[in-house]
């Protein structure tokens, strides 16, 4: 019996040692896997940091600027606090006027009033001149604060509640006034949302025009790129490579050079008009630049390779036996193409269309140079607010709306077609 117990103990000891070895081996494998993952993460860290610094953070900063309103609440804190009890009816009470006069004078003396005046002028036209005039006159007074009547004597416009409503509407640290303006809406003197005056309703129409032009450019690129991609995929390699170099040639040329070349071709005294006059096709020169036509033509030329390449890569992977099998079963060439070949190219169509549409909807330099006033897109208005009017909040709101619409379209595209079905390579 003791011999059997000794043998059993030996077996158990061996099993324990085997189990410990397996545990140690698993721990070593897990440690090795963690090292591999850490090494992979370290290799991708520069790329992640680059994307965050150049892509994610600028977008987040743009979205924050579109709603940031700390400038008013920090510059006029007592006035904003006193306006909380005002109900948009009649003149604000004396406490508001007293706080306002003291704070405006302090801003005028510290040279900070022009910045606030510019911000308020965005919300209500005429506020810049009103605030600067009020600041100058307050600096000449011997005693402060002043009364409601005295403020109205400085400028009679202070008797109009709409100017006080502008301050109350901007009382919070965050505001959606830029987004309302981007949708051609405004907050009136009673605190209600209403449409902008007709002469100031420009952004919604410009958004629709931008989407219409982007869709048109995408469809034209698809119609032109499909036969070119088909030819590339079915030619012998030697000829296909030569044609592919021609397709890629625009990428080796500056975008500015390609855009200005269309100015040379399309202008009234340009090459195309000269050929039309010489051939007798027309006796008058045709306006083909500084309009929507010029923008569409030049952008189709610039974006065409982005449609050709995804189509070509997908078509290259389609076996010709499918088409021949359909023909051998009695299908006409048209039926075989529509029911067999074209459905197989849908991933390439989706990838090319999505890429072309996203690029065209945010294009800036070509509409700016070729489009003129009638051929501009929403990107040109964003650039105007960033460079000329310096209204970064409005630029951020327009960019935010454009980003939102693109994300909605991307989501719808994913639900209908499926992002997993897109292909940019064979």
Go through the PLM ranges and name each one.
Residues 33-37, 240-241, 292-294, 319, ...:
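Amphipathic cytosolic juxtamembrane alpha-helices at the membrane-cytosol interface
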Residues 28, 32, 61, 217-248, ...:
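Transmembrane-helix boundary motif in ABC transporter permease subunits
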Residues 200-231, 342:
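Transmembrane alpha-helix signature in integral membrane proteins
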Residues 1-42, 61, 65-204:
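Membrane-topology segments of multi-pass transport proteins
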């Amino acid at each position: 019996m003791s011999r059997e117990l000794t043998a059993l103990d030996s077996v158990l000891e061996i099993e324990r040692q085997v189990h410990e070895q397996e545990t140690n081996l698993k721990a070593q494998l897990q440690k090795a896997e963690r090292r591999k993952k850490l090494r992979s993460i370290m290799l991708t860290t520069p790329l992640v940091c680059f994307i965050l610094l150049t892509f994610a953070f600028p977008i987040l900063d743009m979205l924050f600027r579109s709603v940031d309103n700390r400038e008013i609440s920090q510059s006029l804190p007592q006035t904003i606090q006193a306006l909380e009890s005002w109900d948009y009816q009649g003149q604000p009470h004396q406490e508001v006027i007293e706080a306002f006069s003291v704070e405006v004078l302090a801003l005028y003396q510290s040279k900070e009033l022009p910045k606030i005046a510019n911000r308020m002028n965005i919300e209500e036209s005429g506020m810049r001149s009103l605030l600067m005039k009020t600041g100058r006159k307050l600096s000449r007074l011997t005693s402060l604060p002043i009364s409601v009547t005295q403020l109205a004597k400085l400028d009679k416009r202070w008797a109009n509640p709409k100017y006080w409503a502008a301050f109350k509407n901007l009382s919070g640290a965050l505001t959606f006034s830029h987004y309302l303006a981007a949708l051609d809406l405004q907050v009136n003197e009673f605190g209600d949302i209403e449409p902008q005056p007709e002469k100031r309703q420009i952004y919604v129409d410009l958004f629709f025009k931008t989407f219409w032009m982007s869709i048109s450019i995408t469809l034209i690129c698809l119609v032109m790129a499909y036969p070119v991609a088909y030819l590339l995929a079915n030619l012998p390699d030697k000829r296909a490579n030569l044609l592919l170099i021609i397709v890629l040639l625009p990428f080796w040329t500056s975008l500015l050079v390609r855009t200005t070349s269309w100015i040379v071709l399309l202008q009234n005294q340009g090459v195309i008009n000269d050929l039309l006059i010489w051939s007798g096709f027309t006796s008058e020169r045709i306006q083909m630049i500084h309009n929507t036509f010029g923008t569409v033509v030049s952008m189709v030329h610039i974006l065409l390779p982005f449609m050709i390449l995804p189509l070509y890569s997908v078509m290259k992977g389609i076996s010709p036996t499918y088409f021949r099998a359909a023909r051998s079963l009695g299908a006409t060439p048209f039926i075989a193409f529509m029911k067999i070949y074209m459905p197989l190219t849908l991933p390439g169509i989706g990838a090319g269309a999505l890429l072309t549409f996203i690029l065209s909807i945010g294009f800036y330099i070509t509409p700016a140079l070729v489009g003129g006033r009638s051929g501009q897109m929403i990107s040109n208005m964003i650039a105007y607010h960033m460079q000329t009017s310096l209204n970064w909040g409005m630029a951020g709101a327009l960019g935010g709306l454009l980003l939102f619409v693109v994300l909605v379209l991307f989501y719808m595209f994913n639900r209908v077609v499926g992002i997993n079905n897109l292909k940019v390579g064979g």
